[in-house]
Amino acid sequence: SVAITFDDAYLSVAENALPELTARGLHSTIFVPARLLGRQPNWTMEEGSPDSEEIIMPAEMIASLPSPLVSLGSHTCTHPRLSRIDPAQAREEIAASRSTLEELTAQDIRLLAFPYGDHNSLVVELCKEAGYDIVFSTIPYGVDTLGSEFVRGRVKVDPFDSRLEFYLKYNGAYAWIPYASFIKRKLRL
């Protein structure tokens, strides 16, 4: 199966992607950093990244988005690397983002995407504690093949991917990467 997701709730997603997806009747989920609405991202990006000029959608736009074809999920409050911050701060980022978005949209927020895909077992437990149904990483697995009902993987697709690259990603050609990373980590011990 395929899930269309967008991290960071950039204004360009609302302006460009959503009209095209809606015209085609395709559902998508936007993961929102709840306390950065209407601002430029405060996180570090690669030099020359097209995202460096982006603006996060303002609150009014986020509030108007939920529909049968557009769902919202949490992307924490301020987009930190959750495994690298104090557990109390991580708990606040995870829980407050959900409550902030629920208050703004009057929708039940049940999904979270980890900023940078960064998580550990404590972060996963904090997400369960906060009441999320499913959380997403950037591990390059299909959405239904990570082996966990709670933590799901995703494969990043970029606008500049060739048709071949898209085909390979769609068909799981990069599913070996987590295994290689695991082995590499074990060999360092």
Region locations from a protein language model:
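C-terminal active-site subregion of NodB/CE4 polysaccharide deacetylases
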Residues: 1-5, 11-16, 84-189
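Metal-dependent polysaccharide deacetylase catalytic core of the NodB/CE4 family, i.e.
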Residues: 1-2, 11, 22-120, 149-152
